[in-house]
Structure formats: C-alpha cells, structure tokens
Amino acid sequence: MKNRKVNFKKRYLSGIALVMGLIFISSCNDGDKGYKEYDPSLPVVIDEIYPDSGGYFDEVILRGENLGSDPKRLRVFFNQKEAIVVGASGDRALIHVPKLPGDECKIGMLLDGNTTDTVFCKQSFKYQKNYQLQYVCGQVGSTNATFVEGNFQTTEFGKNMFNLTADPEGVIYLNHRVTGTGGSLVYINENEFMTKFIAYGDGNAGEPAAPWYDKVTQKVYFTAMRKGYFWEVDPYDSYAVVLRQLVAPNAEYQAKGYRPYKNGDLMWCYSFVRAKDAKGEEWVYCRAYDGTLFRFKFEDRVYDVVGVCPSGAVDNFICGDPEDNTKIYCSLKQKNIVTCLDLSKDISDPGFETVVCGVGGMGGSVGDFQDGHSSIAKMNNPEQILLTRDPETSEKIMYVCDAKNCCVRQFNLATNMMTTVAGIGKQKGFSTGSPKESKLNWPIGICLSPNGDIYIADAGNRVIMKLMFL
C-alpha cells in the first residue's frame, strides 16, 4: 500500500515538472526566437542562479550560455545532490532544488553525457532547510483509557502514552505508563499502516516504562518501574514477549566487586542504555528515581550499583551517545536540565556528571521557555531525548521533548545553541506544518527511524507525529 502511494507521488510530481517545463520552454521560445541548440565546439557558461536562495523543490532558473534545449542532456548538482531539470532554452534552464543539499550550495552542471568536466555557476545558492511536522496515527483528543489496535484510521492510544524507540526495520514501539490493562506495550508499523498490542503491564513489575532497541541482542526491552523487572520483545519471533527480573548480587558476585542496592527492591526505573565503563567493559545501565545508577548484563541479569548520581533524585530518561559509548545523557524532568555522565571517570570525580543544557547548574531551575545559547536556554519538564548527527553539517545534535512547553527542541552540542523545531513554546494545540505553524500538546516520546525521520509521541493529543526535514 505504501509503495503504491510513493509511486503515485512520484508520478504526480513528474507530471507537474513536465507541465512547468513545457510552459517554461514555450515562454522562452515565444520571447526569443533566436535561441541556439547546444554547440559542443563552444564553452558552456553559467552566470547566475535566480533566486539565489530557497528550499526543497523550489523552482530556480540558471542563466548562461550554450545550455541547449534538451533538459535530458543536462545534469545539475547542488553540492553533491542532483536536481531535477525541468526545461532548457539555450541560455536558461529551469531547475527544482533537491532535498537537503547543504546550507551553502555550489552549483555544478554536466552536459551531454560528460561525467568529468563540471561547469560551475559563478553564484552560490543558499538552501533554506524546512522542518515539517506531519500526523501519523491516533485519534486527536481521544478519551479512551486503553489502547485500541488496528489500522491507522481506527487506532486509539490510551491514557499515559509515553516513550518511543525504533528497530532497524522502522517499526516503532510505545509504552503506556500505567498499571493493568491501561499499561500496554504496543508497536506501530507505518509500512503496513497498522498498530498492534504486545502485552499488558504487570502487577509485580508495575507500569511499563521506556522501550529501547538493543543492537547487540536485536531485541526490544521495556523497562518496568518496579523491582527490577523488564519486558523482552523479539521482533524476529513474531514479537514474542517475556517478563524478566534483575537479580541482586549474592555473596559470590559481591566477592567479585558487585554492589547491592541498600534500600530494598530497585524502584522507579525508567530506561536502559548500553555503554562502557572506564575499563572498556560493556554493561546495560539504568538510573532510578533516587539517583542510583546501576548496571547489569543480559547474560545473567545480576545488577551492580555504581553509586548515586550527583544530581540526585529526579524523574529522568537516559540515552546513549552513538559515537562515544562512555557517555550517557540524562534528561532531568523536575530540574529542567540535561546532564552527561562520563563513565570513563569514577562517580566521585567532579567531572562525572556535568550540565549540558538548561540553566541553574546541577540544581536546575524553575521551568520556562527560552531559545538561544545554553547560558540562557530554558526548558520545562524535559522528557525523552535522543542524540544524532545533523544530516547536512554533521554537527552533533540532541532532540528534547520539552513536554510542558508543548514543543520539541534541538540542542546543538557544537554551538551550544537551542532552537525549537516543532510546536510553539507554551502554546498547546494540534497543528501540522512548519515550526512557525505546528502545535503539540505535551510531547513526551521521541525516536529516530532508520531513514532519518523523527517520530514524536504527543501524549496530550493522543497521536504519533513525524518530523521530516526538507
């Protein structure tokens, strides 16, 4: 079904391009009967591009000499991205801007099958990146307490929809953080336009917390809030699910250096992440509400308490750094900050936990909204976060579900600048479109799909949204 929609879109865009090309060539022919065909004995020149800025699929005109009249003989590039050539008329060519070619674009042209002798435009082109928030599924304003599976037109998400993760096939996983039948684990398959129930919350384990896909085991794990439980889901075995529990270290493990939790059962555990300690040993880490950082391995499920994080007790979500597996990033909800744990250091080291963004130091601050440099940027109840690279600049960026501000923020770790990419700060609502028009209502979960799209769980509106970059 999805493939058919994609193909229809391509045919539709191709039809538009053909019509525009005919209009363009016709107008050029009427206004300038003396235009010439391409002459291989003469040089090809590109003097200017008009307009010299724009976004994805915008129309621009190249002006020059000896461009010919056959658009099929022209190949135009914005940096490394090839554009669609709609029409040509001797001294002009009509082009559609390609997707995400880079902020500052050098325009190059190859003509008549030549693959080496690129002709460059004397002007550059400024690409204006555009974020678009799109609806995926769910019923806006639903009052159902429980999840209703089905196709995208009938799916309803229950109360307390929460965090997201994606597997390599692009399937999205979501938890409902509540006990009983309201606390369901579900998956969302956009390729098949359907959602499916996996399991309910458990009386002993408590509310299902954040899902996390582990590349090592190739399974999805939903953390449970109580007693060290977690759900293990196998996407490659019909989503078979098993409820498992972490084990306290006995005398034998304690003799190896494992440390037990001293306050009874592990409680209020939110999310898992895989990372390496100072010795290069790989563990799965979790941070409890009271600030306790502990770790374990799936092979034996015996946990080891690392210590208490300097920032102390707070609702949190943790995520790893895809490029530095000694770092764990923590969004600290009530403190309105994001911190970084450096596992290459001892937990007693002053540099073990540092503030990445948000004001007020390790103690945090009262929630508010402010874009700008990290010295002034403010959040209000940050929830799930993720780290990735900007597809154009390759700068490391972090996306933050700024729940109470009803928006998604982007923090650039290279420039220390915070911007808003979806929703309008402090304005709840429901609206798709650009950052200036889109509205959210308590965005709480976020994940990155294999093809680079960002999915958002909007708990206030009871929908899944998708942030696309154009």
Label the model's feature ranges:
Residues 166-169, 213-217, 275-280, 321-325, ...:
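Residue-level detector of Asp-centered blade-edge/turn motifs that repeat once per structural unit
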Residues 163-164, 209-211, 270-274, 316-320, ...:
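Hydrophobic core register within WD40 beta-propeller blades
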Residues 176-179, 223-227, 235, 277, ...:
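Short loop/turn segments immediately following the C-termini of beta-strands
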Residues 441-470:
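Blade-level signature of beta-propeller repeat domains, shared across WD40, Kelch, NHL, RCC1
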Residues 62, 129-160, 191-209, 236-268, ...:
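Gly/Pro-rich loop segments of beta-rich domains
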Residues 1-27:
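Sec-dependent bacterial lipoprotein signal peptides
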Residues 28-135, 173, 186:
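Ser/Thr/Pro-rich low-complexity tracts
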Residues 171-174, 219-223, 281-287, 327-330, ...:
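Conserved beta-propeller blade signature
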